[in-house]
Amino acid sequence: MAKSTGPIRAAGVVLLREDSGQPLVCVLHRPRQNDWSLPKGKLDPGENEIIAARRETIEETGSDVVLGVPLATQRYKVENRPKSVHYWVGTERPGGPGFTPNKEIDELRWLPVAAAIDMLSYPRDGDLIREAIGQPTTTPFIILRHTEAMRRADFRGPVDAERPLTADGAQHAVRLVDVLDAFDIRKVYSSDSLRCLDTVRPFAHQAHATVAHEPLLSEEGFASSPTAALKRLDQILGDGAP
């Protein structure tokens, strides 16, 4: 098999927990490279960076993770191939399998910030920790467009709000489940258009969440009363829940 020469895409997390009010950082020892680094790994075929960052963190640390704000993307070369690693701040959440030493990662340590930076083998990883620690506490608020819907010109229904997703759109809605779950989304709001409701229903089903119907946030609702629609959006933002 010919050796790949294309770009390498990877994703990772600066994984944090608190101890007596102080942040601790997860650092990992890789015996093959004999180095200390942060949780990260290559994307699987067809995978996006968000899902890969969470998957690699669970696989390498045994801790499930909630992603926070994105951090700087690292870019460097490996064997003359360009590599990009997308990072997020991450915090632990219950449900991980726990860490088991293995041939890929044989040691895991939770260290105070300064000690973690000193332990890491690459200065660029220390820069990521400094960036992560400097981020404010945030709550995710995701604005999501519906997945692929039937073309307006092909739809024969009485009202456009009943225009459905295509088969590809329905598949994309299922793939969004893991993306939304990575941010621990708990409340789901949707326009009352069928294509929007069907985009979020797979996630809502898995998360055991009720989808709140929001007519003002539909295409037609906004067109009829932009001021009321924006006011409703502000109310949802003010709720403060992910």
Which residues does each PLM region occupy?
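Short coil/turn segments at beta-strand junctions that form active-site/ligand-binding loops
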Residues: 22-23, 139, 184-186, 240-242
